[in-house]
A protein has these predicted regions:
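Short glycine/proline-rich turn/loop motifs
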Residues: 115-127
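Bacterial Sec-dependent N-terminal signal peptides
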Residues: 1-20
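Accessory carbohydrate-binding/adhesion or oligomerization-edge regions at the termini
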Residues: 17-117, 197-207
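Accessory beta-strand-rich segments of carbohydrate-active enzymes
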Residues: 28-31, 42, 46-47, 61-65, ...
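Short, flexible, glycine/charge-rich loop motifs used to bind or transfer phosphoryl groups or to couple energy/partner
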Residues: 14, 50-51, 187-188
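Compositionally biased, low-structure terminal segments
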Residues: 7-12, 76, 81, 143
């Protein structure tokens, strides 16, 4: 009986520890409120001419942080002022626009290998020693017109490296990680007529 109780308590402790991990260090979580993957039915050459596709490419407000603890945690709120922030081109890698450091490694991990954690303390010579998990906070706006009423609206990201949270008008829509595949979210219930605020928080590394 004592062994069974001990085993139960041990499993409970492990489960509680897993629950405390952020989504981007939790191997159980790879997406929240994402649409199922599906085939792309619109050819890239036709997207420009499609009236039902609105591109959000362009200049977004942006702030880069060396690690999650230094990010502006409330930036997604509607009353958060980003007027003093820089602007960044989307799509685009922030490392090629003056933020952080480009790293290419097909052998070594760019962070301390301690799965599923990506923020464990690495050797002092690692770039990630002083930049545990660089985080980008992005904000833009888009318009919803009356003719969109009664239509389902989806937010489509063609690739984000490597994990992100998404908010629309201050409400959290979902989470995704998988930098080499698209991510889609149904934002129909989050939008309103007129100007809408989109906030995206991107983490450079995830489990």
């Amino acid at each position: 009986m004592r062994k069974k109780i001990f085993a139960f308590l041990l499993l409970s402790a492990l489960y509680a520890g897993a629950q405390e991990a952020p989504d981007w260090e939790n191997p159980i979580v790879v997406g929240i409120n994402k649409e199922p993957y599906h085939a792309t039915l619109t050819l890239p050459s036709q997207k420009v001419d499609c009236k039902e596709i609105i591109s959000l490419n362009g200049k977004w407000r942006f702030q880069w942080s060396a690690d999650p603890g230094k990010r502006p945690a409330d930036f997604y709120k509607n009353d958060f002022n980003t007027d003093t922030w820089d602007t960044i081109t989307v799509p685009g890698a922030w490392q090629l626009q003056g933020y952080g450091k480009p790293i290419y490694s097909n052998v070594n991990y760019p962070f301390q290998k301690d799965a599923p954690r990506v923020t464990s303390e690495p050797p002092a010579e690692y770039y990630s020693y002083g930049h545990r998990n660089p985080t980008g906070s992005y904000v833009t706006t888009f318009e919803v017109t009356p003719d969109m009423k009664d239509k389902c609206l989806y937010l489509h990201f063609e690739g984000v490296k490597s994990a992100m949270y998404v908010w629309v008008n201050g409400e959290r829509v979902g989470y995704s990680q998988n930098s080499m595949s698209p991510a889609e979210f149904d934002i129909t219930e989050f939008v309103k007529n007129g100007t809408n605020r989109l906030a995206v928080e991107v983490y450079r590394w995830s489990d």
